[in-house]
Every structure is written in structure tokens, then in C-alpha cells.
UniProtKB/Swiss-Prot annotation:
Pathway: Quinol/quinone metabolism; 1,4-dihydroxy-2-naphthoate biosynthesis; 1,4-dihydroxy-2-naphthoate from chorismate: step 2/7; Quinol/quinone metabolism; menaquinone biosynthesis. Homodimer. The gene is menD. It is an enzyme of class 2 (transferase). Keywords: Magnesium, Manganese, Menaquinone biosynthesis, Metal-binding, Thiamine pyrophosphate, Transferase. This is 2-succinyl-5-enolpyruvyl-6-hydroxy-3-cyclohexene-1-carboxylate synthase. Binds 1 thiamine pyrophosphate per subunit.
Amino acid sequence: MSASVFNRCWSKVILETLSRQGVSHFCIAPGSRSTPLTLEAIRLQENGRGTCHAHFDERSLGFFALGIAKASKKPVAVIVTSGTATANLYPAIIEARQTDVPLIILTADRPPELLECGANQAILQQNMFAQYPIASINLPRPSQNYSAQWLISVLDQACFRQKQGGVIHINVPFAEPLYNANNDEIDLHPWLSNIQSWLTQNKNWIQHQEQHTEVITHKYWDQWRTKKGIIIVGRLPSEQAMGIAEWADNMGWIMITDIQSHVKPTLPYADIWLANQTVRKKLLQAEIVIQFGSGFIGKRINQFLAEFKGEYWIIENNQKAVDPYHHAHTRFNAKPHHWLRAHPPMRKKPWLLEPLALAKFCADFIKQRVGSNLNEASLAHNIELLLPKSNSVLFLGNSLFVRLADALSQPSANYPIYTNRGASGIDGLLATAAGIAVGSEQTLVAMIGDTSTLYDLNSFALFKQLNQPAIIFVINNNGGAIFDMLPVDIAVKEKYYRMSHYLEFSHIAAMFDLKYARPYTWADLATVLKQAYSRRETTVIEIKVNPNDGSNIYKDLIDKIGHALIGV
């Protein structure tokens, strides 16, 4: 029997196993060595059991898969050939690991006899992603010496470990030949005879029974709930954010939220008003802080957490450490709604009124300071006006704009907001946004900086695969305006940090056959958005702003609010 047939049998078992573990999207980069895996993924698609996506750039492909997995909340498989194609996936793997997004990376490899001997496109791929995967499976070359049952079991066990997210790396060496295998030869191969019954059923080989761990009420909760408390809410999936705001309100406790929290802020603009030292000192009088989620964007929220010395509780539904300030704390590995149910509130009046007064003052002051012109700060402040009321998702890129949005906006509760704030890189943001559109099957609005866009231009090609409206805002402040915040010499800052490019994006949109608009006023933007939302295609909207406007407004707001005298 030809090696090409058995390579396909081996690949069939791998992909059938992953399909039963919830994988329905296969992101494929072109390459010869990965042919057995690619052809079996295509077979699943032809049988209505999966969707294949192809892209020529592995780095973008990895982030595209990341976006699909974020939005669908299901594992996504990535298939690449051997060599440096595999290394290009590393940034997306890092981001997935940092944010517990389930990716399954399938790297085709040369067989062992072709490694370390000068063979073409052969690098050391085993365990190449170090500690970032939760499981690294280095398969042997396909051989009938290993049973199909063994192969399924190895993969099933790894997928069980992935139930709380993370990356699985499966390295699959194939010897030639790789082509000309007949489907009947594959399906009737005797090696598959012991799993024929399983192949006809849509169930996992190993049936894991779910274990429901009840959250135990803290033994001193009756005492702690009478104290002065603060709720801090970081990055949370929307389904885990329900009930937190009502619970905090009943307790009369201060609640500070991140834009990634999916919780409607009762005290918006926290990253601005926390600059006020008078109010911050009063907040530090709290006796307990309870943290839901993690990954806070705002600098002043992080500074407050670093200063706080009282009782500290963290509710996080995984085993990771999420306290960069190393408080002595109580940790609950639980979903927020389970924890809330086990810790009923005690209705009380608010213990501190100054934050409410300061938040109201901020609202008026911010509106006045950002003005009516179309700029970074006004976009962030009015972001809710740009979004459809339903059936849509928002993706925020990194650098300056995500900080402005976190500090100046008031998003609706449970509006789906996605970010790449695990490692907070500017790579792969367009690709991630495209993946989120695919995974959510909803209208996409993405806000991405100019430097980030230049970093990921190849990913514009992915938007041609979409079948729904997608709006990509490119915020063009002529380089890295986030670095205006740094205390660096102006000439050095311009050359080595900001790196002004003096580019605009109309020709790039045209190259990828995407719609393009450059509005100058809010009225222009309203017209552009109305047209863009009516089309089942992608529109690039370039917002060209003065380089320093966003950072200057941000710094000015922090300075003015920081010194404001607020009475209640």
C-alpha cells in the first residue's frame, strides 16, 4: 500500500478526532508537505462538516484563526507546511496563550531522516513553541505499528486539557509520496477497521463526564459584605458579565470597569477621574477589592490596584495568575455568576459619593474638550454612535486608540467587544478582525491604527472572504502617536519611536478591491456609514487626524481632572 494512502489515513483520523472536539473551521496555508492534512480538511468541508479558509501568509492566517476562535468560542485548526511557515504562527500562538483562546496548530514536518542533514525546508519543529502550548504532541511518522485507537486517544486527551482554552501544537511528519491517494483506498484501508463504528458516529472516543464544582461561600462573607468595597471588572466574555453591575449596586460598592468587561459602567471615564489624587486617596480607604476578570487597559486603574493594600479577592475561571502586583489575596476559580450566587449582596447605601460626582463632571468636561471635530478623541468618546444597534461586533486595535476608547467611551452593556490585549502587540490586528467577522457571522466594526495597518497589510485579502458588512476604521495620525506620551527628546522620538510615514490608504484599499472613504466631518461620516452598512462587503474608512491631537487631549484631560476640586 502506497505511503501516500497511509499518510491520508493518518490525517483522516487526526481531523475526524478534531472535528468531534468541536473544530469546524480549518485555516490552511499553501504548502506541499501538509497536503495529506489539507486534502482531508477539504473532504470534511465537502461533507458539510467544516469550513476551509485559505491564505498565503502564515502570520496573518494564525491571527485570522485566533479571531474565529475568539468569536465562535470554539477551537480552530491551523494547517501549515514545514519550515519557517511554522515559525510565522508564533505571534498568534502567544496571543492565544495569553488570553486562553483555543487554537490547534497542525504543522507538517519532514520525516526524521531528513532533519539536521541539509535537506530542504527542514527545521527542528518538535516543541518549537516552547511553553506556550498547553500540549505539544510530536507524532511519529505515519506507521501501522501505531493503532488508530492510540492516535485518537492521544489527541482526545490533549483536547480535554484545552477545555479552558489555550493552544495545542501537533507536529506531523510525512514522508513522500504525498499525492495520488484514492478516497476509496483511504476509507477501506484495514488500519481503520477497528474504528469503523466510531467513524460513522459523531462522538468523542473518550467520553469525559463534566464535573460541576460548586462555589463555596467564603466563611466570613457575612462580615465582609458589611465593609466598604470596590468591584474591579476587567476582560470578561459577555456571557460571564451578567449580574455583576446589579450586584455591585445592591452592595452600595464602587464599581470600576474596563471596556473589555461587557459591563455597563456606572462610573464611566474611570481612567480619567482616577487621576484625581483626592478621590484616589478616598478610594484607598476601601477595606476590600473584588476583581472579576483581568487584563486592565487603563494606566490609572493599574496604578490604583498597585497602591491598594487591603483585603483582595480575585474571581477568575482558570488557573492562571492574574495579579501583576502580587497582593496577598483570596482566589476563587469560578465563573462570576456562580460566585455571585454563592455570595448574596447586602443592600446598602453607597459608602463613597465623590467618584459619582467626579464621573458626572468628567462627562461634561470631556464633551467640551474633545470638541465637535472628527478626531481620535471624539471618535473614542462617541464610539457608540458609530455602531449598529444589533447583530454587530466591535474590534479595537492596540496602541493609542484602545486607551482613548477605554478612558472616554460608554459602551452598552453586553455589546460584543474584542481586543488582542494578551500580549498587546500591533501585529495581526486586521487578520484578527477578519476572523472575528467570520466567527461571529455579524457586521464588523474595527478600529485600527495606521502603523498597525501597515504592519498587517496582507490581511486585507482576508476581507474578500466575508459575506457581511465590514467597516475598518484606519485612524491615521501619521505614525506611532502613542509614543507622544513618553518623556523622550522630540528629535529622537520622531526618528526612533513615532516614525512618521506620510502615507494614506486609498491605493491600498484599491489594490485589494475594497471600498474606501475619507470623511472630514461627522456629517460626512454619517453618510459613509449609512452606505457601508447597506453593503455586504468591506469598506475602509480612513480618519486622518493631526498627529498630536489625540495624545494631547488625553494628557490634558488627565491633568485637568487630576487637579479638579469636586464637592458632593
